[in-house]
């Protein structure tokens, strides 16, 4: 019995460490999204300046205008590529998060079953609560992903209207940042929940296990 609880706690501790690692990855993605948003703002400002220069461009050679348009197109393509890479990273991060959350809930449920076998009512209540929390988190991610995909579809429908494409890219970046903030908040909540539950079980049900973890 003691060995089983110690193993479950060790597994839960390992999962918490993985959550911390993914929390760091979420921080990096948020920083990347912030940088991309700044670049989008710079592109908008650049577009405004181009419109102003168009007023006096009639007196300049056509080759100068062509060169400016080519440069703008390169910048937009680069921004789109970075957004694509960011979406891929976000998708991988979400998949890892869902897998870790599932394993984390399973380990905590096993721990509660091992320490509270005589009270099936509590076990059932906790199982339902964890299922609702996980479902709510998945629904949030699904909703944000749907909005992001819709923004991408709208962007693709605009054709060669460069100004509209820049606006849609900006919206896409905002949704990416908001989605990453949701995943990061979920990581922090899981970490706080794990700390509270570990403290409670160490003080009441499995004091010897806590001593074993400290030695490890």
Swiss-Prot record:
This is FGFR1 oncogene partner 2 homolog. It is found in: Cytoplasm. Residues 33-102, 131-185 form a coiled coil. It comes from Xenopus tropicalis. One of its GO terms (cellular component) is cytoplasm. It comes from the Eukaryota. Belongs to the SIKE family. The lineage of its organism: Eukaryota, Metazoa, Chordata, Craniata, Vertebrata. InterPro entries: SIKE (IPR008555). Keywords: Coiled coil, Cytoplasm.
